[in-house]
Amino acid sequence: KNYGYFGDNHGNILCINLNNMKPVWYYDNHDDIDATIVCEEENGVPFVYTACEVDRQGDSGMCHIAKLNGLNGEVAWAVQVPCTRHNINNKHFDGGMYSTPLLGGGNCSDLIFSTLANDGVNGDGHFYAFEKRTGKVVYKTKLKHYAWSSPVGFYNEKNELFIVVGDTYGYLYLIEGKSGRVIYDERFGVNFESSPVVVGNTLVVGSRGQSVYKVHIG
């Protein structure tokens, strides 16, 4: 309860004792970390999940995704997904993970979800489900464009997980958590960068262009 975790732009993952502000352990995750670290307890042991983008690696590289023992920094598993830099009008957009991963619950308690940017060609992006125990990719669902916004979850009366995520072209997707099947998608905004706020069966999310959307999932 007294440990905190953070990552920086050089890929350093640090565990800090919050009682005395001294470092406990360190892990090198290779590249710039924008995605927020998430933590989940398993049998009394905290585990942290982290991933990087492709920035200092150059035009192409690997998104390094890792699960670490929160007490000592030992690697439970680490997987790599090839990603690239996307160049548009003399601007570049780094690939990899930007969104905060979503820890699955209910019928998806064995999974963790996130999006990866530029993990293909021409600005491709996919929504991924990873097995918490091994890091194995259970499925990946192609989006119309890559995503930076974090996925959020909804549960029905059967405790089945459904996920909403927005991409950088302004599309919102409703995805079945267990299978990755896209139930619904529609273009609402211009570019979703902010993460949705969920209240009950309703989400609120802002896009570029001074627009805020309220969407009911029913």
Residue ranges and their predicted role:
Residues 1-218:
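Extracytoplasmic/lumenal domain signature
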